[in-house]
Curated annotation (Swiss-Prot):
Protein's gene: atg15
Pfam families: Lipase_3
Subunit structure: Binds to both phosphatidylinositol (PI) and phosphatidylinositol 3,5-bisphosphate (PIP2).
Protein name: Putative lipase atg15
Species assigned in the record: Neurospora crassa (strain ATCC 24698 / 74-OR23-1A / CBS 708.71 / DSM 1257 / FGSC 987)
GO biological process assignments: multivesicular body membrane disassembly; neutral lipid catabolic process; phosphatidylserine catabolic process; piecemeal microautophagy of the nucleus
Amino acid sequence: MLPSGKRKADAFSCTSAARVTAKLALSFLALSTTPLVNAFSYEEPNAQIVLPIDASPIKPLLPEPPAPAEHKFTLRHIYHHGTYEHPTLHRKKDVPAQNADVWLAADDEYGQERIGTLKARSSPVRIQRLADRRPSVVDPMVAYARQQGYASVLSPEAWTMDEVAGPDITDKDTIISLALMAADAYVQTPDGADWEDVGAPFNRSLDFGWEGDGLRGHVFADETNSTIVIGLKGTSVAVFDGDGTTTNDKVNDNLFFSCCCAQQGPWTWHQVCDCATGTYSCNNTCVVQALRQENRYYQAGRELYANVTELYPDANVWIVGHSLGGAMSSLLGLTYGDPVVTFEAVPEALPAKRLGLPIPPGSDPDAPQTREYTGAFHIGHTADPVYVGTCNGATATCAIGGYAMESACHTGRECVYDTVGDLGWRVGIGTHKIRVVISDVLRKYEKVPECKFTPECRDCGNWKMYESNGTETTTTSSTPTSTSMTRTRTETCKTPGWWGCLDETTTTTGMATTTTSEMPTTSTTTCHTPGWFGCKDKTTTSTASTTTTPIATTATTTTTSSTTCLTPGKFWGCYDKTATTDIGSPSTSTELTITSAPALPSSVLTPSATATPPEGQPDDSGKRCRGRTWYGVCKDYEGGEGPVNDL
């Protein structure tokens, strides 16, 4: 018999080989559960293990919005792209950051201003844009949409909502810096760096005057080249270009910024198509067909953007512009999905619709101003008729120049300074200039106005736009009307006076139609003693004879009027006047006979068909006057006596 302690120790030890084998099998099962279950699943399936597992990838977390940052920008490049006179021209000038002096060009009463390092702040901006925004991908879509007449329809997967580092439009210094980037600047370099061709070599024989035509882009970059700003400036702006205006820019701008091709407006507008079918009724299909020729300012802006982004492929791009350059900046921002800040820009919602730019799902293609997340901010003031969309009246500067600026809506948000209410300004085109905006608006106000979204704005509200299948034809016919009149006037003046001729002989020949009654009238007046205000003695005899002959045909009548003045007045008129009117007989066999009146007493003159007193008729003294002065006083009588005052 074993001791008790020995028995307790042996109780915890396994002396059977079968038990050892079972423990090893259980250990292997614990280490490899899944393979063994799969191997023996045909005998005892386990419902919890064979359930399907969701293998879809986990969606990536949304990136954190960029943090606000400070940027210091300097001018790096100047790009110049021709538009109408030199459409193939594309040149670039590099600006050395250390040796160059950048100056703001003088404008009227504003002198030159040196531009140094420009500071700006960035803040998160939400933009709904295409996922693939490369110009090589977007440009063919825009060209196809313009040819088809409607925007391209893309799937929702092609769009993305991004938080990008855009300009802080609540910061005053940032707004002023961006306005200086959009202004007209020039560079003075010690080495006199010249322009270099970016695209095809430009014809050097046409190298004179090219800088006055086209769209110019000033490229600013920060210290790390992580953010660049493209400032667009039209050197030959199609709205206020003066002597450089051509027909082409009026055609393009009136297609984009007018309701119906500059029709039914002031006579000064340059009409560019015939799409109006009635009073404020326009065939929009006709307008789209007229738009197939690409706007050269928009084309120049896209090519300039492509070259700049190729030079800075990983940089964050901001676009700024003024006036027409501001409108082009906004269109580029809608095309490529970049933040935009404009100053006094022409309302561009109407051309954005007609260009057929890509739109996200759920947006109205006929109202681009209803898109909320565009990243565009339009800064302006209430005294600028171009910005507020009122530069289209009969006396407006735009209308006088032939431009129909009827668009009134901006895409994105509007930041409006109320200069009319706050400063008492009057609406005028002089407040549109960028130097006026910088000096008298941006720097004068302490705060930047709130930028508001205005989706309720509507362009061309009084027009009825309709689509058609393109089979309508418009026929306009007119009947030419010709009116001719032949008139002969023969005049011989023998005694000129202060106001006209004192003696006048006139002969008039014309066509007339006879009636059944004719009444010739002869009036003869002879003055022997003229006075200061008329004739002191005046005798007038009027004799009328009427002959009635029924004539039913049309005849030709010749009227002859003869006037002879023997005693001209001292200051004007004639003291004796004899007028004779003869009405010729019609061209028929019937002849009219004038019967002479019977003889009258000597106190009354004898009437006759033609009465012309002899030259040098004597006055009451019985003397004849042989010559008179220019004011009517007789200076020479017969008999050799001197001048006599006959008053």
